[in-house]
Amino acid sequence: SFTEMIDEHFPDDETLMAADGAELEVLNDTLRIMALMFDYLGDWNEIARFYDEHGTRYFEYRIYAELSNQYYEKKYYKSSASTLRAFVDRFPDDDRAPLYYRRLISGYEKAGYPMLRRKHKEIFIERFGVGSPYWETHGEEVRTLITVALGDYIWDLATFAHGWGQQTKSARDKRERLEQAAGWYREYIRSFPKAPDAV
């Protein structure tokens, strides 16, 4: 099977990352075919189903990424995002989880889904933000990866709510939106107390 082939030739992530030339070509072809097969069997959920039965593999992250890319190329944007979300849900403590979630948000941004983009920015902040269980259990390298996106996401949500609050005619909507904006500004200051724009 394809799984056994990767097991044999790429026993760990180091050997997988070091693949080049013809070896890399074979690896990429194998991952592409595996992603197609899982899609044929149903969708992204088939990856977890298969490896729950046959044993978890360190390289599952590559299959999720490949399947997500295939969906995106076909303009199945929500399926692409769901595949990345499935990886994060399956491996919530993985060092790659924030990176995959950032890809999900970026995909919605490029595809023109502003509401979904904002919704998932909120989820990202809640899931990976400063002080979250994920944040507390990961080191500086992973935190840096999170921080790169975190400031942009919080600021975007704050300015969106602020702008909407200023434009709306309804007093109730105005109050709600401005309260939301204030909440996001507070979150920004809490997360980045030393930032020059936090005062």
List where the protein language model places each region.
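Acidic, polar-rich low-complexity tracts and alpha-helical solenoid repeat scaffolds
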Residues: 1-199
